[in-house]
Design a protein with these regions (language model features):
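Iron-sulfur cluster-binding electron-transfer modules in prokaryotic oxidoreductases
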Residues: 1-288
Length: 288
């Protein structure tokens, strides 16, 4: 069984519990063991535009904690994965910045060495575990559910630093969904942003972005909508009703984490997957 240090980030363990619950249910069935380490802090991505050195120091500190235990890091939140990956990219190629950051880490007897890989949700499910291994665990295929996929911004952008899937035509979520019996289909707004990062300054615009995408999904007759990001999930699931008001629509789109749908196909109970915590009408697909 392969072991990874679980880097939970901030949003998943404080708000988006269903993501963590579903991860912890499906991964042991796929021979993955998550190791919980003490001392992790925020990934620092929200600070990037304010202070680069602080941003790198916080990210490097998190990586160093895992390196100390000789573990690679599994970061299921795409924003966290981007922050840690970008930090690793910079420190591995800029010796002076590496030294500067390590001077800060020395206060805690930590050192960034660059020995731990940073693994995303798509890296783990699609590339490391693989669709064949996932298929072996499927007990209740999803009966050709027509599903709209949402990648979000941080899984596929910026492409020049290397992201888990293609920035213009990502297909890894689709490949996984087909493996568990679902029927993912293309729609024009597939690559659009959820709007979540506009909440601080332009909350109405954030909800409009959310509403526009969900309205398209609903109008096109999709059975469900799937994502892998706790920030995006907050927009599409928890804020769906308010988002509908901005586009003059009553939105009733079931929104799932990819890990929840995988869990359902494995025959895991809805309670263990945290489906009772989803605020969108996920019960609508119960009879499909």
């Amino acid at each position: 069984m392969k072991k990874y240090a679980l880097y939970p980030g901030c949003v998943m363990p404080t708000e988006q519990y269903a993501y963590e619950m579903s991860l912890r249910e499906i991964l042991p069935k796929l021979d993955i063991q998550l190791i919980d380490l003490k001392g992790f802090s925020c990934c620092s991505e929200p600070l990037k535009s304010v202070n680069q050195v602080l941003t790198l120091a916080l990210s490097a500190r998190n990586i160093a904690i895992a390196e100390k235990e000789k573990l690679d890091i599994f970061a299921p939140c795409p924003m966290c994965h981007l922050a840690l990956t970008d930090c690793k990219r910079i420190l591995d190629k800029e010796p002076k910045m590496n030294e500067r950051v390590n001077n800060y880490l020395a206060d805690e007897e930590l050192k960034y060495t660059g020995t731990s890989d940073i693994i995303s949700i798509l890296d783990l499910l699609h590339d490391i575990i693989g669709t064949e291994k996932i298929k072996e665990q499927v007990k209740k295929p999803l009966n050709d559910l027509k599903i709209a996929t949402h990648y979000g911004c941080h899984l596929i952008r910026p492409s020049e630093i290397g992201r888990p899937d293609d920035s213009e035509n990502p297909q890894k979520i689709e490949n996984i969904l087909k493996t568990i019996g679902a029927k993912p289909e293309y729609y024009p707004e597939k690559l659009d942003c959820c709007g979540g990062l506009l909440n601080a300054n332009l909350p109405e615009s954030a909800l409009t972005k959310t509403g526009q995408k969900l309205k398209s999904v609903q109008d096109l007759g999709f059975d469900a909508f799937v994502d892998t990001c706790p920030w995006c999930h907050r927009q599409y699931d928890a804020k769906q009703t308010k988002a509908g008001e901005t586009v003059a629509a009553k939105l009733e789109v079931p929104v799932f984490y990819l890990t929840q749908l995988i869990g359902l196909s494995f025959g895991i109970s809805k309670e263990k997957l945290g489906l009772n915590l989803n605020m969108s009408p996920v019960e609508k697909i119960g009879g499909k």
